[in-house]
């Protein structure tokens, strides 16, 4: 791995995607940046985003929502096209945070017909700080299969995996990249709700995690439900589906069984990897994670990112 001779900091003027919301100092900062690959899972059908609701959206946002195109959701109100001095797609903010966190290249996992993402990031939206690649997941059969789709891109290098509809603080990205092996951040459920601003009941749909006294992942529980979190309390640890992997995850993604929900799911593949002897390190993370999975999320994301200028 190439260790860049600097400490994580924002060096350009103005507010960036790395500085949205509140980021607790001293938790994931002062981390030497590491050149890292990242895989963005953008193949989802966007079923929840497509559902009609009473959220007030601009015409461009309404079109993106109807198409389930969460990552291409225009942030901010404007009549100008994306990237032409007007609104920026949500993915620009995600890419900006990845670049600030030390990533040097990104692979989008997309559907065969996802031309909008390819056209934008190969054209006017091409990042200046990141190399862009694409991998096609032919069928929307789960996040484990999505990761498998990026095997050629990852090669034998370590890489990050994250959702395209979540915006993670750049210091968390930097600390994740700086781990010495596979791992993930651990968020306290109550703190995550308070800092991120999404509805409290949403956290019950996230994956819960158990760790040992050395901070190693023991097990991950996909969508355990309200009863689990009621018993675990405010300090229950959850995964926000952002990971550092090495090439061993591909065998686990291949071997993972079909879930009761009819998909090959990445958290279950991590369970397979654990059973195969892979050690996953964890670290306690804080700071807002913005979630753009529903129409009702758009207003909060707009507010949190007001004045932010992404520079991917």
Tell where the protein language model's regions lie, with residue ranges.
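Serine residues within intrinsically disordered or low-complexity segments
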Residues: 12, 16-19
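Extreme N-terminal basic, low-complexity initiation segments
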Residues: 1-9
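The conserved acidic donor/metal-binding loop of glycosyltransferases
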Residues: 164-167
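Conserved alpha/beta core of the MobA/IspD/sugar-nucleotide pyrophosphorylase nucleotidyltransferase superfamily
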Residues: 33-34, 38, 220-312
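Conserved N-terminal catalytic core of the sugar/cofactor nucleotidyltransferase
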Residues: 33-67, 74-161, 261
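Conserved core of the sugar-phosphate nucleotidyltransferase
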Residues: 169-252, 256
């Amino acid at each position: 791995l190439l260790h860049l001779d600097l400490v994580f900091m924002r060096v350009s003027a103005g507010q960036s995607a790395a500085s949205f919301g509140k980021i607790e100092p001293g938790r994931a900062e002062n981390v030497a940046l590491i050149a890292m690959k990242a895989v963005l899972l953008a193949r989802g059908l966007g079923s929840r985003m497509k559902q009609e609701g009473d959220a007030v959206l601009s015409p461009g946002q309404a079109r993106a929502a109807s198409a389930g195109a969460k990552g291409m959701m225009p942030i901010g109100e404007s009549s100008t096209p994306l990237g032409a001095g007007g609104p920026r797609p949500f993915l620009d903010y995600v890419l900006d945070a990845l670049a600030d966190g030390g990533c040097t290249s990104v692979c989008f996992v997309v559907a065969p017909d996802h031309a909008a993402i390819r056209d934008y990031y190969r054209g006017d939206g091409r990042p200046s700080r990141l190399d862009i690649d694409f991998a096609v997941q032919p069928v929307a059969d789960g996040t484990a299969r999505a990761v498998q789709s990026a095997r050629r891109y990852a090669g034998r290098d370590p890489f990050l995996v994250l959702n395209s509809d979540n915006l993670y603080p750049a210091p968390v990205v930097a600390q994740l990249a700086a781990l010495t092996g596979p791992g993930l951040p651990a968020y306290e459920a109550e703190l995550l709700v308070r800092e991120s601003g999404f509805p409290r009941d949403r956290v019950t749909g996230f994956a819960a995690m158990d760790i040992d006294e050395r901070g190693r992942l023991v097990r991950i529980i996909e969508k355990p439900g309200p009863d689990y979190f009621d018993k675990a309390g405010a300090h229950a640890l959850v995964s926000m589906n952002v990971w550092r992997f090495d090439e061993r995850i591909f065998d686990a993604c291949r071997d993972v069984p079909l879930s009761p929900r009819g998909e090959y799911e990445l958290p279950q593949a991590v369970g397979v990897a654990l059973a195969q002897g892979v050690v996953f390190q964890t670290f306690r993370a804080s700071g807002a994670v913005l979630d753009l999975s529903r129409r009702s999320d758009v207003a909060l994301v707009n507010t949190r990112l007001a004045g932010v200028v992404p520079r991917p």
